Amino acid sequence: MTRLFSWAAALSVVSVFSVSQVSAYVGEVHNYTRRATTGNGWDIDGKSFDYVIVGGGTAGLVLANRLSADGSNSVAVIEAGPSGYEDNDKFIVPSAMLYDSAVNTQYDWQYKTTSQKHLNGKEKSWPRGKVLGGSSAINGLYYVRPSREEADAWAELAGKNGWNHWGWDNLLNGMKKSEKLQTPLKSVREQAHIEYDGSSHGRNGPIHTTWPAVTYGPVGAFIESASKVAVPRVKDAYGGENHGTYVALSSMNKRNWQRSFSRNEYLDPISDRNNLQVLTGHLVTQVIFDRSDKNHVQATGVHYKASVDEVEHTVHANKEVILCAGAINTPQILQLSGIGSSDLLNRHGIDVVVDLPGVGENLQDHISFGLSFRVKNDKDVAPQQITGNKKTDSYVNSAVSYVNFESLF
């Protein structure tokens, strides 16, 4: 039986509902005092914003920043998890992801996959960030890109206008716009055998990328061994060909050796914008629709709660409701709001707003696994703990080999 919480299509991470097609319309702008992230659901209850963004994660905070930039639009963001400020080191210290991880804590949705036939029926953990910054706050800091073939496949799937917005060339421009590449330290570059092409990277974006301030012998040894035995080294893994062995960039700021993610790069610098309100600790339960015109259903707001037993709140959208709740929660909210397979919705007693069978189906994620081995000299490996030294604690193991799994079978 298909479950209401079934996996989402990978391309449905961000869904946008247009409320007004009148370009001259100017929505109401709330003149708040200095904006602060709040956990009080009453602070936005009953109010109207031009844009209501559901999910303060990797994509949601980027949109909040850009939509509120010129001051003419009011923006509300609703994040299910906490702000994370009270546990800041868990997010900003890179090696914390190895020794003090936010995975399997309150900052993680702690999802598990369904039983996997080719893993002897096992269910596997699938971490998803439940905090401001989303998965960009709790991941392993790997900064990698898809291959040209994958990006171009998205354009094909998007239909006749897909090449106007998707495809490798368009996506590369966007990826470079968001990136600020910082060169590796000479000692690290030599020891880890780091190779890259600067022309494939951005230099002025909010997200800082670089390599850790320290590295260790096994990293360079892995690059040499894997490239000779199995997967050849790739010299420009960010230019459209990522199949190969290389040391991946980390989303890290070389100035302070801290994680660079959507919260501290897109939200924190704009904390004084009075047209932006961020609510944490509240789940959106349903999108509200105006169905007066059966041929043009419009989203006009959302309902949200602090928990199942708490009071339900409502916030209204003048222009758009934007779902940025991730690959699982975005389609879940759509289904709970009546958008999805009519057969599934009817079985669960949900009023069908739009019969759209693809919602919540066909998600496939990449497979990854690590290699473990003993070393003869334990002085040539990371210290296995957070040390308090910023350079030492910047270490994350980012030596990778990407292969086309279809070629293995």
Task: Pin down the residues of each PLM region.
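N-terminal redox-cofactor-binding region of secreted/periplasmic oxidoreductases
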Residues: 3-409
